[in-house]
Amino acid sequence: MAIPSNLMQFSEDIIKQLTPEEIDEFREAFMMFDKDGNGTISTKELGIAMRSLGQNPTEQEILEMINEVDIDGNGQIEFPEFCVMMKRMMKETDSEMIREAFRVFDKDGNGVITAQEFRYFMVHMGMQFSEEEVDEMIKEVDVDGDGEIDYEEFVKMMSNQ
């Protein structure tokens, strides 16, 4: 089966972005999942690994997970495909963490972080800033200039750290 070149390129781009530490961590996890040591993770091995992590996927869910990253279409996950899968999962976790952090800042739940909410959070985190400093921080991320931080502005701020 021919591999779509754009899918192959996308996977190569993701792998190039990995740090040496991420590659080491992923390789360690891959070797734990690859029970028979043949260099691939089968549906059976993925199922065992997921159950050991407290998940209980159906056979169909396992097949779907493999198919999402199975670049060469052989029904198994090789290390580069595993890296793509792990990086994708990390991105999803990051966005969940950003969403949760936004909820913490947005005390009244109205979808924006006011200067007052931002200041309240900073004080409760033990950070002492003057009114001017808080206003300056908000100005830096307040793209639309409304004096508040909306979700998109917050995501941009958190992503630029």
From Swiss-Prot:
Ca(2+) 1 binds at residues 34, 36, 38, 40, 45. It holds the Pfam family EF-hand_7. InterPro entries: CALM/Myosin/TropC-like, EF-hand-dom_pair, EF_Hand_1_Ca_BS, EF_hand_dom. GO terms for molecular function: calcium ion binding. Ca(2+) 4 binds at residues 142, 144, 146, 148, 153. Keywords: Calcium, Metal-binding, Repeat. SUPFAM superfamilies: EF-hand. Residues 21-56, 57-92, 93-128, 129-161 form the EF-hand domain. SMART domains: EFh. Ca(2+) 2 binds at residues 70, 72, 74, 76, 81. Belongs to the calmodulin family. PANTHER family: CALMODULIN LIKE 3 (PTHR23048:SF0), MYOSIN LIGHT CHAIN 1, 3 (PTHR23048). This protein resembles calmodulin in sequence but possibly resembles troponin C in function. This is Calmodulin-like protein. It comes from Caenorhabditis elegans.
